[in-house]
Amino acid sequence: LLDGYDFVLISFALPAIKEAFSLTLVQSASLISAAFISRWIGGLVLGAIGDRYGRKPAMVLSIFMFAFGSIACALAPNFWILFILRLVIGFAMAGEYSASAAYVIESWPKHMRNKASGFLLSGYAFGVIAAAQVDKYFVTWVDSVHPGWGWRALFLTGIVPIVVAIYMRRTLPEAADWSEAKEKGDGEKNDMLAVLFGGQRKILNYIVVVIAFVGLMVIFT
Protein backbone atom coordinates (compact mmCIF):
# COMPACT_ATOMS: atom_id res chain seq x y z
CA LEU A 1 0.00 0.00 0.00
CA LEU A 2 2.78 2.48 0.89
CA ASP A 3 4.53 1.69 -2.38
CA GLY A 4 1.49 2.54 -4.49
CA TYR A 5 0.64 5.56 -2.37
CA ASP A 6 4.11 7.07 -2.64
CA PHE A 7 4.51 6.43 -6.36
CA VAL A 8 1.29 8.29 -7.19
CA LEU A 9 1.85 10.91 -4.47
CA ILE A 10 5.12 12.15 -5.95
CA SER A 11 3.57 12.12 -9.43
CA PHE A 12 0.73 14.37 -8.27
CA ALA A 13 3.04 16.69 -6.33
CA LEU A 14 5.72 16.99 -9.02
CA PRO A 15 4.22 19.83 -11.13
CA ALA A 16 3.85 22.04 -8.04
CA ILE A 17 7.35 21.12 -6.80
CA LYS A 18 8.82 21.91 -10.22
CA GLU A 19 7.22 25.34 -10.12
CA ALA A 20 8.11 26.04 -6.48
CA PHE A 21 11.82 25.25 -6.90
CA SER A 22 12.15 26.23 -10.59
CA LEU A 23 13.40 22.75 -11.50
CA THR A 24 14.53 21.48 -14.87
CA LEU A 25 12.87 18.45 -16.43
CA VAL A 26 15.83 16.25 -15.42
CA GLN A 27 15.71 17.44 -11.82
CA SER A 28 11.98 16.83 -11.66
CA ALA A 29 12.32 13.31 -13.02
CA SER A 30 15.14 12.55 -10.59
CA LEU A 31 12.76 13.05 -7.65
CA ILE A 32 10.81 10.04 -8.89
CA SER A 33 13.84 7.95 -9.79
CA ALA A 34 15.56 8.69 -6.45
CA ALA A 35 13.29 6.23 -4.68
CA PHE A 36 14.38 3.50 -7.10
CA ILE A 37 18.08 4.24 -6.60
CA SER A 38 17.99 3.37 -2.91
CA ARG A 39 15.47 0.54 -3.04
CA TRP A 40 17.92 -2.27 -3.59
CA ILE A 41 20.04 -1.38 -0.58
CA GLY A 42 16.93 -0.78 1.52
CA GLY A 43 15.69 -4.25 0.75
CA LEU A 44 19.11 -5.67 1.57
CA VAL A 45 19.63 -3.88 4.90
CA LEU A 46 16.08 -3.99 6.24
CA GLY A 47 15.69 -7.54 4.94
CA ALA A 48 18.76 -8.53 6.96
CA ILE A 49 17.26 -6.83 10.02
CA GLY A 50 14.11 -8.87 9.44
CA ASP A 51 16.15 -12.07 9.24
CA ARG A 52 18.07 -11.35 12.43
CA TYR A 53 15.62 -9.52 14.69
CA GLY A 54 12.22 -10.44 13.29
CA ARG A 55 9.79 -9.45 10.56
CA LYS A 56 7.75 -7.18 12.81
CA PRO A 57 10.67 -4.93 13.92
CA ALA A 58 11.76 -4.58 10.28
CA MET A 59 8.24 -3.58 9.23
CA VAL A 60 7.84 -1.07 12.05
CA LEU A 61 11.27 0.47 11.40
CA SER A 62 10.64 0.82 7.67
CA ILE A 63 7.21 2.41 8.22
CA PHE A 64 8.69 4.93 10.67
CA MET A 65 11.43 5.73 8.14
CA PHE A 66 8.85 6.21 5.39
CA ALA A 67 6.76 8.48 7.62
CA PHE A 68 9.80 10.53 8.65
CA GLY A 69 10.90 10.93 5.03
CA SER A 70 7.43 11.93 3.87
CA ILE A 71 6.89 14.48 6.65
CA ALA A 72 10.38 15.92 6.12
CA CYS A 73 9.63 16.27 2.38
CA ALA A 74 6.79 18.62 3.33
CA LEU A 75 9.34 20.89 5.02
CA ALA A 76 12.09 20.61 2.39
CA PRO A 77 13.57 24.05 1.55
CA ASN A 78 15.24 23.11 -1.73
CA PHE A 79 15.71 20.46 -4.39
CA TRP A 80 18.73 18.66 -2.90
CA ILE A 81 17.16 18.17 0.51
CA LEU A 82 14.07 16.81 -1.20
CA PHE A 83 16.18 14.49 -3.35
CA ILE A 84 17.98 13.06 -0.30
CA LEU A 85 14.66 12.53 1.47
CA ARG A 86 13.35 10.69 -1.58
CA LEU A 87 16.34 8.35 -1.24
CA VAL A 88 15.29 7.71 2.37
CA ILE A 89 11.73 6.96 1.28
CA GLY A 90 12.91 4.53 -1.39
CA PHE A 91 15.14 2.79 1.15
CA ALA A 92 12.20 2.45 3.55
CA MET A 93 9.69 1.26 0.95
CA ALA A 94 11.88 -1.61 -0.18
CA GLY A 95 12.34 -2.74 3.40
CA GLU A 96 8.65 -2.41 4.13
CA TYR A 97 7.69 -4.55 1.15
CA SER A 98 10.26 -7.27 1.80
CA ALA A 99 9.42 -7.45 5.52
CA SER A 100 5.66 -7.37 5.03
CA ALA A 101 5.79 -9.98 2.27
CA ALA A 102 7.81 -12.32 4.48
CA TYR A 103 5.54 -11.61 7.46
CA VAL A 104 2.29 -12.27 5.60
CA ILE A 105 3.49 -15.44 3.90
CA GLU A 106 5.07 -16.83 7.08
CA SER A 107 2.02 -16.02 9.20
CA TRP A 108 -0.73 -17.45 7.02
CA PRO A 109 -1.50 -21.19 6.90
CA LYS A 110 0.53 -22.99 4.23
CA HIS A 111 -2.51 -23.86 2.11
CA MET A 112 -3.46 -20.15 1.90
CA ARG A 113 -0.08 -18.59 1.18
CA ASN A 114 -0.75 -18.11 -2.53
CA LYS A 115 -3.81 -16.07 -1.60
CA ALA A 116 -1.77 -14.17 0.97
CA SER A 117 0.74 -13.18 -1.70
CA GLY A 118 -2.02 -11.95 -3.99
CA PHE A 119 -3.64 -10.06 -1.13
CA LEU A 120 -0.36 -8.32 -0.41
CA LEU A 121 0.13 -7.23 -4.02
CA SER A 122 -3.39 -5.80 -4.16
CA GLY A 123 -2.29 -3.25 -1.58
CA TYR A 124 -0.51 -1.32 -4.36
CA ALA A 125 -3.84 -0.59 -6.04
CA PHE A 126 -5.37 0.58 -2.76
CA GLY A 127 -2.40 2.89 -2.26
CA VAL A 128 -2.92 4.42 -5.70
CA ILE A 129 -6.62 4.98 -5.00
CA ALA A 130 -5.89 6.53 -1.60
CA ALA A 131 -3.33 8.95 -3.05
CA ALA A 132 -5.71 10.00 -5.82
CA GLN A 133 -8.49 10.77 -3.35
CA VAL A 134 -6.18 12.69 -1.02
CA ASP A 135 -4.94 14.78 -3.95
CA LYS A 136 -8.45 15.39 -5.26
CA TYR A 137 -10.00 16.58 -2.01
CA PHE A 138 -7.39 17.41 0.64
CA VAL A 139 -4.75 19.04 -1.56
CA THR A 140 -7.34 21.05 -3.48
CA TRP A 141 -8.73 22.36 -0.19
CA VAL A 142 -5.29 23.28 1.18
CA ASP A 143 -4.38 25.11 -2.03
CA SER A 144 -7.62 27.07 -1.83
CA VAL A 145 -6.72 28.23 1.69
CA HIS A 146 -2.94 28.56 1.30
CA PRO A 147 -1.97 28.68 -2.40
CA GLY A 148 1.21 26.76 -3.19
CA TRP A 149 1.11 24.65 -0.02
CA GLY A 150 -0.96 21.79 -1.38
CA TRP A 151 2.01 19.61 -2.34
CA ARG A 152 3.51 20.04 1.12
CA ALA A 153 0.22 19.02 2.72
CA LEU A 154 0.23 15.94 0.50
CA PHE A 155 3.54 14.82 1.99
CA LEU A 156 2.31 15.58 5.51
CA THR A 157 -0.20 12.76 5.16
CA GLY A 158 2.84 10.56 5.78
CA ILE A 159 2.07 10.97 9.48
CA VAL A 160 -0.76 8.43 9.11
CA PRO A 161 1.57 5.38 8.79
CA ILE A 162 3.04 6.26 12.20
CA VAL A 163 -0.29 5.36 13.78
CA VAL A 164 -0.24 2.06 11.87
CA ALA A 165 3.32 1.34 13.01
CA ILE A 166 2.46 1.97 16.66
CA TYR A 167 -0.56 -0.31 16.38
CA MET A 168 1.54 -3.04 14.76
CA ARG A 169 4.26 -2.75 17.39
CA ARG A 170 1.76 -3.20 20.20
CA THR A 171 -0.60 -5.83 18.82
CA LEU A 172 0.92 -7.97 16.05
CA PRO A 173 2.68 -11.21 17.02
CA GLU A 174 5.94 -12.17 15.34
CA ALA A 175 5.71 -14.33 12.20
CA ALA A 176 5.31 -17.97 13.23
CA ASP A 177 7.84 -19.38 10.76
CA TRP A 178 10.51 -16.87 11.78
CA SER A 179 9.97 -17.57 15.47
CA GLU A 180 10.26 -21.29 14.84
CA ALA A 181 13.46 -20.87 12.83
CA LYS A 182 14.93 -18.64 15.53
CA GLU A 183 14.24 -21.25 18.19
CA LYS A 184 16.09 -23.80 16.07
CA GLY A 185 19.03 -21.43 15.66
CA ASP A 186 18.58 -20.95 11.90
CA GLY A 187 18.17 -17.18 12.00
CA GLU A 188 21.84 -16.26 11.97
CA LYS A 189 22.59 -18.62 9.09
CA ASN A 190 20.08 -16.84 6.86
CA ASP A 191 21.27 -13.31 7.60
CA MET A 192 21.65 -11.72 4.16
CA LEU A 193 24.30 -9.20 5.23
CA ALA A 194 26.41 -11.97 6.73
CA VAL A 195 26.07 -14.02 3.55
CA LEU A 196 27.10 -11.15 1.26
CA PHE A 197 29.69 -9.36 3.36
CA GLY A 198 31.06 -11.95 5.74
CA GLY A 199 32.54 -14.59 3.46
CA GLN A 200 35.72 -14.96 1.45
CA ARG A 201 34.35 -12.77 -1.33
CA LYS A 202 33.37 -9.85 0.89
CA ILE A 203 35.85 -7.42 -0.73
CA LEU A 204 34.53 -8.26 -4.19
CA ASN A 205 30.97 -7.86 -2.95
CA TYR A 206 31.75 -4.45 -1.45
CA ILE A 207 33.17 -3.33 -4.79
CA VAL A 208 30.11 -4.61 -6.66
CA VAL A 209 27.79 -2.77 -4.27
CA VAL A 210 29.63 0.53 -4.78
CA ILE A 211 29.65 0.09 -8.57
CA ALA A 212 25.93 -0.74 -8.57
CA PHE A 213 25.05 2.30 -6.46
CA VAL A 214 27.14 4.68 -8.57
CA GLY A 215 25.70 3.16 -11.74
CA LEU A 216 22.14 3.69 -10.55
CA MET A 217 22.93 7.30 -9.59
CA VAL A 218 24.34 7.96 -13.06
CA ILE A 219 21.46 6.27 -14.88
CA PHE A 220 18.60 7.78 -12.90
CA THR A 221 19.98 11.27 -12.29
Roles of regions detected by a PLM:
Residues 1-221:
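Transmembrane-helix signature of 12-pass secondary carriers
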